[in-house]
Design a protein with these regions (language model features):
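Short, solvent-exposed segments of well-ordered alpha helices
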Residues: 8-11, 38, 310-317
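Amphipathic alpha-helix face/heptad-repeat signature
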Residues: 10-13, 43, 168-170, 315
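Short E/K-rich amphipathic alpha-helical oligomerization segments
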Residues: 15-41
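Amphipathic alpha-helical coiled-coil segments
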Residues: 24, 40-66
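Short, charge/polar-rich alpha-helical segments
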Residues: 1-19
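Coiled-coil termination/hinge junctions
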Residues: 64-75
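Long, low-complexity, intrinsically disordered N-terminal extensions of eukaryotic proteins, enriched
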Residues: 34, 54, 61, 108-110, ...
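A structural boundary/capping signal
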Residues: 74-416
Length: 416
C-alpha cells in the first residue's frame, strides 16, 4: 500500500534537500579558499537546519500513520493465556564490524516486553538469534502477579559467530527469530519441577547485516524513529599497533628535526607536521573527496572504510580513511588524537597538551595537495563552524571523539 500523501511529500522534500546538501559538501571538500569556505559552510548549515526540521516532521507523521494502522490490532496471547509478549526490533541494520563492542543495555538488537495480566506468578523464557549468524541469546524471568511488577522488558543482543560474519563484504539479508515460552510447573511433595513449555510467541523479523568493512555512523530505532548515534565506534578502526602503522611511524620520525617522535615530551605541532609530511611524500596516497554516505530514508547511516594498513597498501583514502590513518599514527606516537564527524564529512584533531581540552584540527584530504598550515586552517574553520551549529541544539552536527576517552570510558578497542 502506498504511503499517505503527506508522508510522500515530506520524503520528496527531504530527498531534494539531501541532494542539495551533498552538492554543497562536495564544494566544501574541493575548496581551499578560506573565504569561499566560510560562505559555503553558512549555506550548508542552513540546509542542514531545514533537513533536521523536515526529518522531525516526517518522523512524527510516520508515527501517527503507524498508530492509526495499529488501532485495531489484537494480541491473541493476552486474551487466551493472560501473557502478552511484545517483540520490538531496535535496529534494522546489524553493524557487524563493531557489533561485539555494543552493550545490550544501551544498544540492543531487540527488546521484548512481557506483561502478566493474571493473578498467578509466571516464569518465562525468551530466546533470540540471528539465523545462521549468531548464538542463542536466552533470558528467563519471573513475572509477578498482575500489577506494577507484572511487566518486564528484556533487552537482547545475540552474540555473532565470527566465522559467519567475516565473509560479509556486501549488505546481506538475515532473519531474527524470537521465541517466547512459558515454563509450566507442577508440584510433588512440596517440590516444583518443570512439566512443559508453552509457546507464547514465535516471531521472525527481517534485518540487514552490514558488510564487515562498513563503519556505522547511526542506526534508526524502528520504534521511536530516532537516530541512535554510533559514530564513537569509528574509534575501533583506529589501529595504532598494527605493524604497517608502526613501520610508517618510523618513516614519519625521519621527517622530524630530532629524528624521533616523543609524544608530549616534545613539541606536538612538529610531530603532527612530520606525520603530515611523511604521508605527503612517502605514502603515495591518493586522497578522494568522497562524502560519508547515507540514505536518510533508510535505517542506517555509515561509510565503507579502509583500515589504516589498507590505506598504506592500497594508496587510497577518502576523508574517513585518512582521518583514521592519521589518528592511528598520532596515537602510536603517544599523542591524543580525536575523530571529528560533521555532516557528510570527517577530519582529525589532536590535543595540544595532555588532558588540556584544547584541540588542533587538520583536513586530511588536503595532504596530497596543500601545506600543513593550509590543511590546519581549513580543518580549524570547519570545526569552528560546525561546533557553533551544534551548540544551537543539534549535537549531531559536531562530534569530536577523543580516542583516549573512547578507549577508557567506552571500552572501544582497536579492531586489530
Amino acid at each position: 500500500m502506498p504511503a499517505p500523501t503527506d508522508t510522500i511529500s515530506l520524503r520528496q522534500e527531504l530527498y531534494d534537500l539531501r541532494l542539495q546538501a551533498g552538492r554543497l559538501q562536495q564544494e566544501i571538500l574541493a575548496t581551499t579558499d578560506p573565504d569561499a569556505l566560510d560562505a559555503l559552510l553558512t549555506t550548508a548549515g542552513e540546509v542542514e537546519g531545514r533537513i533536521a526540521t523536515i526529518e522531525t516532521t516526517l518522523r512524527q507523521t510516520e508515527q501517527a500513520d503507524g498508530a492509526t494502522a495499529r488501532k485495531h490490532a489484537v494480541t491473541r496471547s493476552s486474551k487466551t493465556t493472560g501473557l502478552d509478549a511484545n517483540v520490538r526490533l531496535r535496529m534494522m541494520h546489524v553493524p557487524t564490524a563493531i557489533y561485539h563492542l555494543l552493550d545490550a543495555n544501551t544498544d540492543p538488537l531487540l527488546e521484548v516486553e512481557l506483561v502478566n495480566s493474571k493473578s498467578d506468578e509466571r516464569r518465562v523464557r525468551v530466546t533470540a538469534r540471528i539465523e545462521g549468524y549468531s548464538a542463542d541469546a536466552v533470558t528467563t524471568v519471573e513475572l509477578e502477579r498482575r500489577g506494577g511488577a507484572a511487566t518486564q522488558t528484556i533487552y537482547l543482543l545475540p552474540t555473532l559467530f565470527p566465522q559467519a560474519v567475516i565473509p560479509l563484504h556486501e549488505l546481506t539479508r538475515a532473519t531474527v527469530t524470537v521465541l517466547v515460552e512459558e515454563l509450566i510447573f507442577a508440584s510433588d511433595n512440596n517440590k516444583q519441577f518443570s512439566t512443559a513449555l508453552r509457546i507464547e510467541a514465535h516471531v521472525s523479523l527481517p534485518v540487514w547485516m552490514l558488510a564487515r568493512n562498513s563503519a556505522p555512523l547511526a542506526v534508526r530505532d524502528p520504534q521511536s524513529g530516532e537516530w541512535v548515534d554510533l559514530s564513537r565506534y569509528f574509534g575501533a578502526f583506529v589501529t595504532p599497533n598494527q605493524p604497517e602503522v608502526m613501520a610508517f611511524l618510523r618513516k614519519a620520525a625521519g621527517h622530524h628535526p630530532q629524528q624521533r617522535l616523543a609524544g608530549y615530551q616534545s613539541d606536538v605541532a612538529s610531530q603532527a607536521r612530520a606525520i603530515f609530511d611523511a604521508l605527503k611524500e612517502d605514502a603515495d596516497i591518493t586522497y578522494v573527496n568522497s562524502l560519508i554516505a547515507f540514505n536518510p530514508d533508510e535505517s542506517a547511516r555509515g561509510q565503507r572504510v579502509r583500515l589504516p594498513r589498507e590505506c598504506l597498501s592500497e594508496h587510497q583514502a577518502n576523508c574517513i580513511d585518512g582521518t583514521l590513518l592519521f589518528a592511528s599514527l598520532l596515537e602510536a606516537a603517544s599523542l591524543h588524537p580525536a575523530i571529528v564527524v560533521v555532516p557528510g564529512h570527517a577530519f582529525v584533531a589532536w590535543e595540544r597538551s595532555p588532558d588540556s581540552g584544547r584541540w588542533e584540527y587538520l583536513e586530511t584530504t588536503m595532504i596530497g595537495t596543500n601545506t600543513f598550515a593550509e590543511a590546519q586552517e581549513i580543518g580549524g574553520r570547519k570545526a569552528e563552524f560546525w561546533e557553533k551549529q551544534a551548540a544551537g541544539g543539534d549535537a549531531s552536527k559536531f562530534r569530536r571523539w577523543p580516542i583516549k576517552e573512547l578507549r577508557t570510558a567506552y571500552g572501544i578497542t582497536p579492531l586489530e
